[in-house]
Amino acid sequence: MVLLSKFDFSGKESGKVELPDAFFAEGKEQSVKDYLVAIQANKRQWSACTRGRSEVSHSTRKPFRQKGTGNARQGCLAAPQFRGGGIVFGPKPKFDQHVRINKKERRAAIRLLLAQKIQTGKLIVADNSVFISSLNAPKTKEALRFLKECNVECRGVLFVDGLDHVGSNENLRLSVRNLAAVRGFTYGENINGYDIAAARNIVVSEKALELLVENLVSTTKD
């Protein structure tokens, strides 16, 4: 069992959070790499399409007569050497090239990424009150003070909240979105492995951490 400190909005420790040892079980680094590469690859639209010689709109006349001009003979304006002609061996959306990742592999990769952040001290747990009732109105100055009080490096910070609090955390979300140090604001079940890997620091609510442990550790036992 691993104990993590949780902090209130004043930056003081308000308790401990327990994490099972299974959350820190060893995983395959290659599976993490495959997962991150798949996320990046799937951002592509895979819709690039070009028209070949037989598809472009063109006149059927010869550019000029066959003989007597001194030029090389040409038969069609749709030939690729002419401006507006067809493309040779251009890209075609022949099939869906999206990369699929199994649910178990995805969860194992996210668990390993989060475990690495915890072990390197790049993840802090915030009390649920920080996300729900810490601010009566959006205040960027207060959000920045919270990060400094918790000794969080103000660079590439990712906030993660639990889904149960959607709407009630609006003041905090509006407060942090104007900070250059904040990478994003997301929810536990929508978390993306690439966001975890790219974030330098993660601030996660106690509720979101419970959801993540519940969803990720169950796959380790399978």
Swiss-Prot record:
This entry carries the following GO cellular component terms, namely: ribonucleoprotein complex; ribosome
Protein name, per record:
Large ribosomal subunit protein uL4
Which PANTHER family does this one have? 50S RIBOSOMAL PROTEIN L4, LARGE RIBOSOMAL SUBUNIT PROTEIN UL4M
Gene of this entry: rplD
One GO biological-process annotation of the entry reads: translation
What's its job? One of the primary rRNA binding proteins, this protein initially binds near the 5'-end of the 23S rRNA. It is important during the early stages of 50S assembly. It makes multiple contacts with different domains of the 23S rRNA in the assembled 50S subunit and ribosome. Forms part of the polypeptide exit tunnel.
Cite the entry's keywords alphabetically: Ribonucleoprotein, Ribosomal protein, RNA-binding, rRNA-binding
Query: What family name appears in the similarity comment?
Result: Belongs to the universal ribosomal protein uL4 family.
Q: Which SUPFAM superfamilies match?
A: Ribosomal protein L4
Using the UniProt annotation, give all residue ranges assigned to the region (Disordered): 50-72
Q: Which NCBIfam families match?
A: rplD_bact
State whether it acts alone or in a complex, and with which partners, per the record: Part of the 50S ribosomal subunit.
- Which GO molecular-function terms appear in the entry? rRNA binding; structural constituent of ribosome
Recorded source organism is Chlamydia muridarum (strain MoPn / Nigg)
> Looking at the record's lineage, which domain of life comes first?
Bacteria
Annotated InterPro entries: Ribosomal_uL4, Ribosomal_uL4-like, Ribosomal_uL4_dom_sf
**The keyword Metal-binding belongs to this UniProt entry's keyword annotation:** no
Q: Which Pfam families match?
A: Ribosomal_L4 (PF00573)
- Note whether Endoplasmic reticulum occurs among the keywords: no
